[in-house]
Amino acid sequence: MSDYQVLLYYKYTTIDDPETFAKEHLAACKEMELKGRILVATEGINGTVSGTVEATNKYMDYMANDARFADMVFKIDAADSHAFKKMHVRPRAEIVSLSLEEDVNPLEITGDYLEPAEFRDALLDEDTVILDARNDYEFDIGHFRGAVRPDIQNFRELPGWIEDNRDQLEDKKIVTYCTGGIRCEKFSGWLKTAGFEDVSQLHGGIATYGKNEETKGELWDGQMYVFDERIAVPINQVNPTIVGKDYFDGTPCERYINCANPYCNKQILASLENEKKYLRSCSHECRVHPANLYTKELSKEEFTERLQAIDETLPETVQ
């Protein structure tokens, strides 16, 4: 039995003073020795925290005693240690950043909820468009079979992508999904305000689908990206596969790294071997960038040799 747990949760509810709430909530979390990242806004709370089983259970009880969060659903993952290095509770304008000119309140308008078994049926329906509401790098390490991959790097780019591709979605039955459900609550509501009529969402997100006893994560390929130290977690309990491809050679890969150029910081899938071979950098420009954190640790001679090994050279200004 694991000694730690990771809790994923959200709740759209009114928080009158997010700044004061954040300060008091941070103190409570630290007292329980939790670590994680929580966003609070007037529209609600969105968080992921880790801690011992005892501490996380205490936290769930603590939240249940607040009428605003009494019915909040927690997605619980067993863990061997903390999934975060620190504890942050931050006030924000939104608990998910869609940055609309006219905000959408999921308590007033949102897509129909599909439970895991219903969502699986939708996956098998050729007349249904399954739309991934996550970022491209999340999709690349794992997604539902046949899902549409929007070419976006931030959630706030999704409405623009929809408008650019409206002709492919018009008059279609749309079912959307995300990690835990929070993004789809607002996004599916926006879809309805944007004129799409038949809009549904996976209730509880991928995390709930993967733990459902009926679906057991079936028809999910790869792993689910998470925004903590774990990076990705398994979902499919029936016939797991690897869909991620190494950025450098296209071989199967589920290991994410960040480009060593801090001005880039692009997330790429790469084996340990290729990380070393390509100096943990996504391009030649990033490899020779003066701020590169990986190459700073190399002597000029070693740097030159490593570049030559991949048929590259130092710029004349560096030589």
Swiss-Prot record:
Top class in the EC scheme: oxidoreductase
Assigned EC number: 1.14.-.-
GO biological process: tRNA modification
Boundaries of every Rhodanese domain copy: 124-218
Sorted UniProt keywords: Oxidoreductase, tRNA processing
Sequence similarity: Belongs to the TrhO family.
Keyword presence, Cytoplasm: no
Name listed for the protein in its UniProt record: tRNA uridine(34) hydroxylase
Catalytic site: 178
Pfam families, sorted: Rhodanese, Rhodanese_C, UPF0176_N
PROSITE patterns: RHODANESE_3
Domain of life of the organism encoding this protein: Bacteria
Catalytically driven reaction(s): uridine(34) in tRNA + AH2 + O2 = 5-hydroxyuridine(34) in tRNA + A + H2O
UniProt cross-references to SMART domains, sorted A to Z: RHOD (SM00450)
Protein's job: Catalyzes oxygen-dependent 5-hydroxyuridine (ho5U) modification at position 34 in tRNAs.
